[in-house]
Curated annotation (Swiss-Prot):
Gene name per UniProt: yicU
Organism domain of life: Bacteria
Source species: Escherichia coli (strain K12)
Name listed for the protein in its UniProt record: Protein YicU
Additional note from the record: Encoded antisense to yicL; it is entirely within the yicL coding region.
Induction annotation: Expressed in equally in both exponential and stationary phase in rich medium (at protein level).
Lineage, highest ranks first: Bacteria, Pseudomonadati, Pseudomonadota, Gammaproteobacteria, Enterobacterales
Length: 19
C-alpha cells in the first residue's frame, strides 16, 4: 500500500488511514 499512500496526498496527512 506504499504506492496508494504516495498517490493519495490525503493519506500522507493521515498515516492511520494509510495503514
Amino acid at each position: 500500500m506504499t504506492s496508494d499512500y504516495r498517490v493519495s496526498p490525503i493519506k500522507k496527512s493521515r498515516p492511520a488511514m494509510s495503514k
